[in-house]
From Swiss-Prot:
Keyword terms, alphabetized: Cell inner membrane, Cell membrane, Cytoplasm, GTP-binding, Membrane, Nucleotide-binding, Ribosome biogenesis, RNA-binding, rRNA-binding
Matches recorded under Pfam families: KH_2, MMR_HSR1
PANTHER family in the record: GTPASE ERA (PTHR42698), GTPASE ERA, MITOCHONDRIAL (PTHR42698:SF1)
This protein's name: GTPase Era
One annotated GO biological process: ribosomal small subunit assembly
HAMAP family referenced in this protein's UniProt entry, alphabetically: GTPase_Era (MF_00367)
Family: Belongs to the TRAFAC class TrmE-Era-EngA-EngB-Septin-like GTPase superfamily. Era GTPase family.
Binding positions for GTP per the UniProt entry: 21-28, 68-72, 130-133
Keyword Nucleotide-binding appears in the UniProt entry: yes
């Protein structure tokens, strides 16, 4: 990767930070809060993030490159689950700092599995105890913190609210202190290394998660078939939603097409905010049986590029 040289000879600092944890503890929400905008999709469903998302936060001489990973989990029956675990595990290897995000309200066997993987990590680990806004009596956290710090030698322990922003500044201060002197890897205006095409597919997938609730399992993905700027300066985006069964297709389309229409309206609005440009979005739904267990299909959909 080409490094970015500054105009003067002022010292600059850069480093890589992995955000890890089990599914649905708020990793993507934390990254979005740090960056000040949404680049990593969120929903109440676990395992919303399927790819390693790189978020870039440049503040004067400091550039922190964050890797938001899929949630690590024990279940590995399907090819897509194995690939997500592989992506999350590989992110731990070559970073300057690891932020281990846990839910302050409970701990489970997936948390324990992540913690065991961190024992092999060379980088210092910060324990970020999230969702503290859901804990009325903060003294109740003390036994939880004591138990976790007895399990692992954390460099820092920071109770946070990724949603509300509580103690995020303190966490960012720890991140800055972990950065090494060196030239920045990305231009100052970059907030992610992902393409607009990729971000469009993620936005559509987020809306699918939100509008189908628990009706639709995780055997759904989005392929962008067209992404172009037309002569009027509008992005023309065609998204193909892949599901595994005919019944799932009906769920996505909804009664008289109302659900897919709402998904399209919300996705287009998010794209226009992110791309700062007018967007014309068209969506289709197609049944592709067994795609989540087919490594060739996963490769073509971008799940094996990491």
């Amino acid at each position: 990767m080409n490094e970015i040289k500054t105009a003067d000879n002022a010292k600059t600092y850069c480093g890589f930070i992995a955000i890890v944890g089990r599914p649905n503890v708020g990793k993507s929400t934390l990254l979005n809060k740090i960056l000040g905008q949404k680049i990593s999709i969120t929903s109440r469903k676990a395992q919303t993030t399927r790819h390693r998302i790189v978020g870039i936060h440049t503040d004067g001489p400091y550039q922190a490159v964050y890797v938001d990973t899929p949630g690590l989990h024990i279940e590995e029956k399907r090819a897509i689950n194995r690939l997500m675990n592989r992506a999350a595990s590989s992110a731990i290897g070559d970073v300057d700092l690891i932020i281990f995000v846990v839910d302050g309200t409970h701990w489970n066997e997936d948390d324990e599995m992540v913690l065991n993987k961190l024992r092999a990590a060379k980088a210092p680990v910060v324990l970020a105890i999230n969702k503290i806004d859901n804990i009325k009596n903060k003294e109740e956290m003390l036994p939880f913190i004591t138990e976790l710090t007895s399990k692992f030698d954390f460099a820092h322990v920071v109770p946070i609210s990724a949603q509300g922003g509580k103690n995020i500044a303190e966490l960012e201060k720890i991140v800055r202190e972990s950065l090494h002197e060196g030239t920045h890897h990305f231009p100052e205006e970059y907030v992610t290394d992902r393409s607009q095409r990729f971000m469009a597919s993620e936005i559509i997938r987020e809306k699918l998660m939100r509008f189908t609730g628990d009706e639709l399992p995780y055997s759904v993905t989005v392929e962008i078939e067209q992404f172009k700027l037309n002569e009027r300066g509008t992005y023309e985006i065609n998204g193909l939603i892949l599901v595994e069964r005919e019944g799932q297709k009906k769920m996505v389309i909804g009664n008289k097409g109302q659900k897919i229409k709402q998904i399209g309206i919300e996705a287009r609005a998010d794209m226009e905010r992110l791309f700062d440009n007018k967007v014309h979005l068209e969506l289709w739904v197609k049944v592709k049986s067994g795609w989540a267990d087919d490594e060739r299909a996963l490769r073509s959909l971008g799940y094996m590029d990491e």
